[in-house]
Amino acid sequence: MHLIIAGREYSGSTTLSQTFGEWGAANMEGGRWGPNEYHDHWKLPHISNFSPPPPDEVASVVACYPDARDGDYTRTGLSHEEQAQIMALSPKLKEMVQRYHLQYHLHPSFYGQDDHIMVGAHFDEGILGPIYFDYGGDGQYADRRVSNRSYEKQILELGPDTILVLVTASPDAIRQRMKDNPHLHGALQDADVERVLARYEEEYADSLLTRKTRLDTTSATIEESTGEIIEKITALMTDDDRQRIKGGAA
């Protein structure tokens, strides 16, 4: 299965990638469905792989990274010092790192695996770069509105069955989540919520990926949204992937 789950910070895209991964581990034959097998690396400065801590180390990890208390360890892959080093890079270097980083994840070796799941990918990188990091904007080098379509052409060549899921939520819900569990070194600012949500909608509308769907997490529980994303993804799977579901049905 080739899958991209995209959504603004606090929308639930990372949470749902994790719960969908848990479903995949329990219900899909073959593939790699470990807790960090999906690729969620495009929200600067959180661009490194992470490893969920063993139970006896959870408390110490949460003490160092308080926003991991709900079990989201995607912002723990780099030390605080390393995150500061990433953020100290010039816009030119940030652009280069992210461009090379994304291109690496479009290597045919990834698409040769049974499953290749990215979270955010060119959506996160191409939207956050121009708004917060002064690169890839209109008229700048590697304009992300242009390069995102180029990335999608590559994706369609490598994985024409790629499914795109846009996870969204209302501005009020996003702001409440920002208040309830602020992310360490998160990019999103209160004043930009509507603007950033609008950019995700634009990218979704302009996407060349035709197997696409969306879900709104505004008022849904995690369990309800998990059920919805499973239903919507399985409806868009290839027949081969659907046959990998244990028991033959979702």
PLM feature spans:
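A glycine- and Lys/Arg-enriched "phosphate-lid" helix/loop adjacent to the NTP-binding pocket
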Residues: 125-202, 243-246
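Glycine-rich phosphate-binding P-loop
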Residues: 5-20
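NTP-dependent small-molecule kinase module
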Residues: 24, 180-184, 188-250
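Phosphate-binding beta-loop-alpha motif at adenosine-nucleotide cofactor sites
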Residues: 6-7, 161-169, 173, 177, ...
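Conserved substrate/cofactor phosphate-moiety recognition/catalytic segment
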Residues: 18-108, 124, 128-130
